[in-house]
Amino acid sequence: MISTLLTKIIGSRNDRTLKALRKIVKQINAMEPQFEALSDSELQAKTAEYRQRLEQGETLDQLLPEAFATVREASKRVFGMRHFDVQLIGSMVLDSNRIAEMKTGEGKTLTATLPAYLNALSGRGVHVVTVNDYLAKRDAEANRPLFTFLGMTVDCNVPGMDASQKRDAYAADITYGTNNEFGFDYLRDNMAFSPEQRVQRPLNYALVDEVDSVLIDEARTPLIISGPAEDSSALYIQVNKLIPQLIKQDKEDTEEYTGEGHYTVDEKNRQALLTENGQIFVEELLKREDLLAEEDSLFSATNISLLHHVNAGLRAHTLFERNVDYIVQKDEIVIVDEHTGRTMPGRRWSDGLHQAVEAKEGVKIQNENQTLASITFQNYFRLYDKLAGMTGTADTEAFEFQQIYGLDTVVIPTNKPMVRKDMGDLVYLTAQEKYAAIVEDIRGCVSRGQPVLVGTVSIENSELLSGILTKENIPHKVLNAKFHAMEAEIVAQAGQLGAVTIATNMAGRGTDIVLGGNWQAEIAQLDNPTDEQIAELKAAWQVRHDEVLAAGGLHIIGTERHESRRIDNQLRGRSGRQGDPGSSRFYLSMEDTLMRIFASDRVTGMMKKLGMEEGEAIEHPWVTKAIENAQRKVEGRNFDIRKSLLEFDDVANDQRKVVYEQRNELLDTNDISETIHVIRDDVYGAVIDEYIPPQSLEEMWDVPGLEARLKADFGLDLPLQQWLAEDDKLYEEKLRERILDEATKLYAHKQELVGVEVLRNFEKAVMLQTLDGLWKEHLAAMDHLRQGIHLRGYAQKNPKQEYKRESFDLFTQMLETLKRDVVSILSRVQVQERDVEALEEQQRQQSEAAPRTYTHATAESQLADEEAAGEEGHTTFVRDEQKIGRNDPCPCGSGKKYKHCHGQLT
């Protein structure tokens, strides 16, 4: 109560922020006459002037009012559009490492031009991040005339570009592209074999459109680049034939319960698990197919791979539905993004799940993949010096943006008041009754000429509703992952008089629905339109626009509540843009996924006891509140998944930073002979310690063993026993020095034979190739450790602490192995110039030609495992991505200085 009173007196934090920003808006508006008086050439010269002032010590904040006034004036001249005051406020929020919530139709694309221009003045590059290629290309082309007028270069980064094109794209002042492509380019750059193969510059400023979709919805799925592993497609096919023979076990208190089944399904956690009865039955089936030995168990250590195949097959059959989670296209399984409804060609599920789904659908099974590089969006975007984002729906996730990314959310007021009417939810007992009510609502809208947008949560539901409308002779268009190519055209005309559009998840569509249809799209279809034709089309559109306004504007129908309130708000937000009238209503049934999983059985029982007749619905604020509480539960659980994923990935991220930093230093250094010398002394010293322990008696020495080891590992044939026999005073330290001297002489002799330059190039090539091979193996080891670490919870140990400790041990072992392998190769090999060229060519071919897969890994199962093991609370993460100094503590957690720990390689 006291906090509410204080808010009324001094305003909310959001109000105070807006009040401060409005003062700067007044400054910008006061400059407008001054900039209007400038000629085009004088206005264009401002960019060079600002850059010069930056070099002389002024800051971007000091330049902001003038820079924004410059862009606003240029926009008036190039586009005939003037930035509203609320767009200036949004731009200032975006420039200050915050998230701007701007409602649909408020001009986010135009708003982004202001902070993009300001931050591009530094010459360090700006990345404008969108959720798909279509929007990246569209926004780049739409804003190119404005930026070109101001002397800025613009380019677009999309899949399918070669390295040269990508390098040009990143060299531009402002680069538009998708979150996936920026992330994968970062990983590819850290797999390059020469500096010329890298395409990205240091990461400066990222401006993320639909920021909630990128940083929250997709944060659960790490970006993974993988290469082919061994082929096991036959086993997937054999296991796939067995899964349909298993019987699902239902809850004992349900009508479907028929006794103990073979597996249980946990839809909430996306898990399918064999029961004890199921384990016995599966073992019998496997033995019958000669996949398991008679006396063997599925859970023995030798059958881990077989168990993995069974689990993948079970999940494929029970949790992943065709036309909901994926579609079959050209004999391939194509994943459907659950958040945007878009297909993701080229993306594959990990952990053998994709192969299991391929076996289930009878399409060609592609090889399993081994991880070569991976990163989460959370850790990728925290690499930028400045990060900001905009979306129509961020306020419900403001806590997460602050907790994970350290980004505050500011709600930007609309330019015109919002007049959309949001009606209460209608809840029916069955889906059939719900769809009947939806059809009647649509029929009423069509009769009065009101356009309707119907939102569904899956392709399957959109096609089901489309079939019902077709039977009822109601003309309509369908917008889902199957009809990608027609997407922009369908959205552009969804505001036509009486139009009916069915759409899977509207998040990220990025195209405004203009009431009366999009007259600009009609003009674009004409070849060289005359002024008269344009005027006629505009006049005809104005008539249609007024008719649609009179009919009530765009009506939104939700056929099901999504698991996130934010996605529901995105659907609603398609209506009521720029003060237009509109309305929205959600129709639900007790058979909907969200209601079935999270709404209690008591609600269904209560509805039946109330004597509800067929076709009747419940509409009450209590019901709507109960549904929102269910959504909050899901949102909280998904937040836990994302935070848990980040906590585990942060361990790998610390190691990734060390490896990638060392790798980049290797690429940029032509001479690593000093590093090789230090490593060689370390490796020889460690080997000598094994056979001649420090400060030990001579009787404890294993000299013959040391001789054999030096020869086998390093090609070093030294008569150690003869040396000791000839020299009584050859003590431990002297012997060490003599061995190292001999090793150094032999290496120097090798350098004389092949030449300094050839050996330097060979050292670098060997170091890179060995590091990449070991890093790949280390990632696989980390994956295996990650999958089983939750079991430590049963032993009353903290799985995260155990993971940190063991991953550090693995990382230390990897670096020791790297030093030993590099020294061994360089010592034993007989180098010739053509060997160096062959090795470099082999690396180049591997880099360019190796088939790679770009995937999103599933994360739900990880959280389910951790919940089962009873994990402890989470920690808060803040942005902290500074470059590691040589005297800083090593990020691996050892407590040593970086230069004395994992920095010693470089």
From Swiss-Prot:
Keyword Ribosomal protein: no
Cofactor annotation: Zn(2+)
Family matches, as Pfam families: P-loop_SecA, SEC-C, SecA_DEAD, SecA_PP_bind, SecA_SW
PROSITE patterns: SECA (PS01312), SECA_MOTOR_DEAD (PS51196)
Disordered: region residues: 839-896
Residues annotated to bind Zn(2+): C890, C892, C901, H902
Entry GO terms, CC: cell envelope Sec protein transport complex; cytosol; plasma membrane
EC category: translocase
GO biological process terms, semicolon-separated: intracellular protein transmembrane transport; protein import; protein targeting; protein transport by the Sec complex
Subcellular location: Cell inner membrane; Cytoplasm
Keyword hit for Cell inner membrane: yes
Gene Ontology molecular function, alphabetical: ATP binding; metal ion binding; protein-exporting ATPase activity
Subunit structure: Monomer and homodimer. Part of the essential Sec protein translocation apparatus which comprises SecA, SecYEG and auxiliary proteins SecDF-YajC and YidC.
Name of the protein in its database record: Protein translocase subunit SecA
Gene: secA
